[in-house]
Amino acid sequence: MSKRDYYEVLGVSKSASKDEIKKAYRRLAKKYHPDVSKEENAVEKFKEVQEAYEVLSDEQKRAQYDQFGHAGSSQGFGGGDFGGGFGFEDIFSSFFGGGSRRRDPNAPRQGADLQYQVTLEFEEAIFGKELNVEIPVEDPCDTCHGSGAKPGTTKETCKYCSGTGQISVEQNTPFGRIVNRQTCRHCSGTGQMIKEKCTTCHGTGKVRKRKKINVKIPAGIDNGQQIRVAGKGEAGVNGGPAGDLYVVVHVREHEFFERDGDHIICEMPLTFAQAALGAEVEVPTVHGKVKLKIPAGTQTGTEFRLKGKGAPNVRGYGQGDQYVVVRVVVPTNLTAHQKELLREFAGQEDKDDSLFGKLKRAFKGE
């Protein structure tokens, strides 16, 4: 089943402000919260609302979603925490009296996402490229297989929090006794303690290493876009899945080509004679040189379209065009004969063929 549009999920317009999106999210999250809602598919709807908010609350993710739809939003952007800054715990706290639901400290958790910057030449971005990148990651320790405990030993349940990862702290206040729950400092909230630590990773369960990863850059990618490589981020916690790697692409400027989405733009200088009398010229494209007929009387700023000579759409939706913008170069070092002909040209209102012929031969050195 295809995903619903994120704006439709939250019930907001595509021009909605951040505050409108946040209000819609809070309202729907409260409505479909599994602990409150009695609707049969409340869990699925709650997850759908969470996913929509995660994308639309982030400016970069939202811009990419607006451009590419669900295919673009799945690529992600940035490193570290990719959440929208207002998650499940915020909702639970604001709606249900400030006390967040206790999570299993030993439950599997996904590893952190990583970001890698890569710079491509203009043509490499047009045609795509396969790269082998080397990134620093934290992988599970091979010695203890990620447990952090010395081989042959096991973790023990924390005696201070009885494996809950939290301890209760009582406080007497003018309003009575208040019990607060805090993260257990003895086990750092894991609920387990390592009596004999692994000597390789010193009890962390992870080791820092450099990993080589093959990344396929799709043809037509543009400056600032990114590729998501699933499962190539940091190792998961407690057996959870690894995070993702996001490769952010930067494209070097070209000497005379410019990108405008899938289209390529270049400026074509023409001599006075070529522009006035017409000519056939060779135009460079990323696909090779092509011949272009310039009609007589072409002016600076005139634009010619070379169909299919642009960049391929990164999502596979066709091919862009190349636009050639004319710039007429006014001659600066004229011979006496050329000056004489131009004066004759300026003085004649009827620009007859014989004068055009003289001008053409003069400017071509014939």
UniProtKB/Swiss-Prot annotation:
Cofactor needs: Zn(2+)
Record GO biological process: chaperone cofactor-dependent protein refolding; DNA replication; protein refolding; response to heat
PROSITE patterns on file: DNAJ_1, DNAJ_2, ZF_CR
Cofactor note: Binds 2 Zn(2+) ions per monomer.
Residues annotated as domain J: 5-69
Binding site for Zn(2+) 2: 158, 161, 184, 187
Keywords: Chaperone, Cytoplasm, DNA replication, Metal-binding, Repeat, Stress response, Zinc, Zinc-finger
Zn-finger segments (CR-type): 128-210
Matching InterPro entries: DnaJ, DnaJ_C, DnaJ_domain, DnaJ_domain_CS, HSP40/DnaJ_pept-bd, HSP_DnaJ_Cys-rich_dom, HSP_DnaJ_Cys-rich_dom_sf, J_dom_sf
SMART domains: DnaJ
Annotated positions binding Zn(2+) 1: 141, 144, 198, 201
Gene Ontology MF terms in the entry: ATP binding; heat shock protein binding; unfolded protein binding; zinc ion binding
Subcellular location: Cytoplasm
Highest taxon listed in the record's lineage: Bacteria
Quaternary structure annotation from Swiss-Prot or TrEMBL: Homodimer.
Free-text comment on this protein's domains from its UniProt entry: The J domain is necessary and sufficient to stimulate DnaK ATPase activity. Zinc center 1 plays an important role in the autonomous, DnaK-independent chaperone activity of DnaJ. Zinc center 2 is essential for interaction with DnaK and for DnaJ activity.
Family assignment from sequence similarity: Belongs to the DnaJ family.
Function: Participates actively in the response to hyperosmotic and heat shock by preventing the aggregation of stress-denatured proteins and by disaggregating proteins, also in an autonomous, DnaK-independent fashion. Unfolded proteins bind initially to DnaJ; upon interaction with the DnaJ-bound protein, DnaK hydrolyzes its bound ATP, resulting in the formation of a stable complex. GrpE releases ADP from DnaK; ATP binding to DnaK triggers the release of the substrate protein, thus completing the reaction cycle.
Record's protein name: Chaperone protein DnaJ
Species whose genome carries this gene: Bacillus cytotoxicus (strain DSM 22905 / CIP 110041 / 391-98 / NVH 391-98)
